[in-house]
From Swiss-Prot:
<dbReference type="InterPro" id="IPR005745">
    <property type="entry name" value="Ribosomal_uL14_bac-type"/>
</dbReference>
<dbReference type="InterPro" id="IPR000218">
    <property type="entry name" value="Ribosomal_uL14"/>
</dbReference>
<dbReference type="Pfam" id="PF00238">
    <property type="entry name" value="Ribosomal_L14"/>
</dbReference>
<comment type="function">
    <text>Binds to 23S rRNA. Forms part of two intersubunit bridges in the 70S ribosome.</text>
</comment>
<dbReference type="GO" id="GO:0022625">
    <property type="term" value="C:cytosolic large ribosomal subunit"/>
</dbReference>
<dbReference type="InterPro" id="IPR019972">
    <property type="entry name" value="Ribosomal_uL14_CS"/>
</dbReference>
<dbReference type="GO" id="GO:0003735">
    <property type="term" value="F:structural constituent of ribosome"/>
</dbReference>
<comment type="subunit">
    <text>Part of the 50S ribosomal subunit. Forms a cluster with proteins L3 and L19. In the 70S ribosome, L14 and L19 interact and together make contacts with the 16S rRNA in bridges B5 and B8.</text>
</comment>
<comment type="similarity">
    <text>Belongs to the universal ribosomal protein uL14 family.</text>
</comment>
<protein>
    <recommendedName>
        <fullName>Large ribosomal subunit protein uL14</fullName>
    </recommendedName>
</protein>
<dbReference type="GO" id="GO:0006412">
    <property type="term" value="P:translation"/>
</dbReference>
<dbReference type="GO" id="GO:0070180">
    <property type="term" value="F:large ribosomal subunit rRNA binding"/>
</dbReference>
<dbReference type="InterPro" id="IPR036853">
    <property type="entry name" value="Ribosomal_uL14_sf"/>
</dbReference>
<keyword id="KW-0699">rRNA-binding</keyword>
<keyword id="KW-0694">RNA-binding</keyword>
<keyword id="KW-0687">Ribonucleoprotein</keyword>
<keyword id="KW-0689">Ribosomal protein</keyword>
Amino acid sequence: MIQQESRLKVADNSGAREILTIKVLGGSGRKFAGVGDMIVATVKQAIPGGNVKKGDVVKAVIVRTVSDVRRADGSYINFDENAAVIVKDDKSPVGTRIFGPVARELRDSDYMRIVSLAPEVL
Protein backbone atom coordinates (compact mmCIF):
# COMPACT_ATOMS: atom_id res chain seq x y z
CA MET A 1 0.00 0.00 0.00
CA ILE A 2 1.30 3.40 -1.01
CA GLN A 3 0.27 6.48 0.92
CA GLN A 4 1.28 10.10 1.23
CA GLU A 5 5.05 10.56 1.81
CA SER A 6 5.84 7.06 0.49
CA ARG A 7 9.04 6.88 -1.55
CA LEU A 8 9.06 4.74 -4.68
CA LYS A 9 11.69 3.62 -7.15
CA VAL A 10 11.07 4.75 -10.74
CA ALA A 11 10.95 1.80 -13.15
CA ASP A 12 11.53 3.66 -16.42
CA ASN A 13 14.17 5.72 -18.23
CA SER A 14 12.48 9.10 -17.79
CA GLY A 15 15.47 10.39 -15.81
CA ALA A 16 13.99 10.11 -12.32
CA ARG A 17 15.37 7.54 -9.89
CA GLU A 18 13.15 8.08 -6.83
CA ILE A 19 9.82 9.84 -6.26
CA LEU A 20 7.88 10.85 -3.15
CA THR A 21 4.09 10.54 -3.12
CA ILE A 22 2.20 13.79 -2.67
CA LYS A 23 -1.37 12.58 -3.24
CA VAL A 24 -3.28 9.44 -4.15
CA LEU A 25 -5.68 10.18 -7.01
CA GLY A 26 -9.16 8.70 -7.32
CA GLY A 27 -11.62 10.23 -4.90
CA SER A 28 -11.61 12.66 -2.03
CA GLY A 29 -10.14 11.33 1.18
CA ARG A 30 -8.54 8.31 -0.46
CA LYS A 31 -5.59 7.25 1.70
CA PHE A 32 -3.93 4.29 -0.02
CA ALA A 33 -2.94 3.25 -3.53
CA GLY A 34 -2.11 -0.16 -4.92
CA VAL A 35 -0.93 -1.61 -8.22
CA GLY A 36 -2.53 0.19 -11.16
CA ASP A 37 -3.45 3.33 -9.21
CA MET A 38 -2.27 6.80 -10.17
CA ILE A 39 -0.49 9.14 -7.77
CA VAL A 40 0.91 12.66 -7.85
CA ALA A 41 4.55 12.71 -6.80
CA THR A 42 7.66 14.85 -6.73
CA VAL A 43 11.04 13.77 -8.04
CA LYS A 44 13.55 13.33 -5.21
CA GLN A 45 16.48 11.86 -7.16
CA ALA A 46 17.18 12.29 -10.87
CA ILE A 47 20.02 11.62 -13.28
CA PRO A 48 21.57 14.43 -15.35
CA GLY A 49 20.12 14.92 -18.82
CA GLY A 50 16.82 13.18 -18.13
CA ASN A 51 13.36 14.27 -19.22
CA VAL A 52 12.37 15.07 -15.64
CA LYS A 53 14.38 17.01 -13.09
CA LYS A 54 14.63 16.95 -9.31
CA GLY A 55 11.71 18.86 -7.82
CA ASP A 56 9.34 18.29 -10.74
CA VAL A 57 5.77 17.36 -9.85
CA VAL A 58 4.69 14.37 -11.93
CA LYS A 59 1.93 11.79 -12.22
CA ALA A 60 2.90 8.14 -11.85
CA VAL A 61 1.30 4.71 -12.01
CA ILE A 62 2.24 2.11 -9.41
CA VAL A 63 3.57 -1.08 -11.05
CA ARG A 64 5.07 -3.00 -8.08
CA THR A 65 4.28 -3.05 -4.36
CA VAL A 66 5.72 -4.92 -1.40
CA SER A 67 2.25 -5.46 0.05
CA ASP A 68 0.24 -8.38 -1.33
CA VAL A 69 -2.16 -7.92 -4.23
CA ARG A 70 -5.05 -10.39 -4.19
CA ARG A 71 -6.17 -11.78 -7.52
CA ALA A 72 -9.58 -13.07 -8.58
CA ASP A 73 -8.45 -16.71 -8.38
CA GLY A 74 -7.46 -16.27 -4.73
CA SER A 75 -3.70 -16.11 -5.27
CA TYR A 76 -1.50 -13.29 -4.04
CA ILE A 77 1.48 -11.56 -5.62
CA ASN A 78 4.01 -9.19 -4.11
CA PHE A 79 7.37 -7.75 -5.09
CA ASP A 80 10.62 -6.85 -3.35
CA GLU A 81 10.20 -3.09 -3.82
CA ASN A 82 7.67 -0.35 -4.43
CA ALA A 83 8.02 1.03 -7.96
CA ALA A 84 6.15 3.36 -10.29
CA VAL A 85 6.27 4.56 -13.90
CA ILE A 86 5.98 8.28 -14.65
CA VAL A 87 3.14 9.01 -17.08
CA LYS A 88 1.73 11.95 -19.02
CA ASP A 89 -1.83 13.21 -18.62
CA ASP A 90 -3.02 10.81 -21.37
CA LYS A 91 -1.68 7.81 -19.38
CA SER A 92 1.21 7.17 -21.78
CA PRO A 93 4.66 6.70 -20.19
CA VAL A 94 7.23 9.50 -20.33
CA GLY A 95 10.10 7.04 -20.75
CA THR A 96 10.66 4.66 -23.64
CA ARG A 97 11.75 1.65 -21.58
CA ILE A 98 10.39 -0.11 -18.49
CA PHE A 99 12.74 -1.87 -16.07
CA GLY A 100 11.74 -4.97 -14.13
CA PRO A 101 8.50 -6.93 -14.04
CA VAL A 102 5.07 -5.33 -13.75
CA ALA A 103 1.85 -6.77 -12.33
CA ARG A 104 -0.84 -8.19 -14.61
CA GLU A 105 -3.39 -5.87 -12.97
CA LEU A 106 -2.14 -3.01 -15.19
CA ARG A 107 -3.73 -4.78 -18.17
CA ASP A 108 -7.18 -4.04 -16.71
CA SER A 109 -6.43 -0.37 -15.99
CA ASP A 110 -5.89 1.21 -19.46
CA TYR A 111 -2.10 1.01 -19.19
CA MET A 112 -1.47 -1.36 -22.11
CA ARG A 113 1.44 0.77 -23.33
CA ILE A 114 3.28 0.11 -20.05
CA VAL A 115 2.45 -3.60 -20.24
CA SER A 116 3.75 -3.82 -23.81
CA LEU A 117 7.04 -2.11 -22.91
CA ALA A 118 7.65 -4.24 -19.80
CA PRO A 119 10.13 -7.12 -20.11
CA GLU A 120 7.96 -9.37 -17.93
CA VAL A 121 4.35 -9.34 -16.77
CA LEU A 122 3.61 -11.32 -13.60
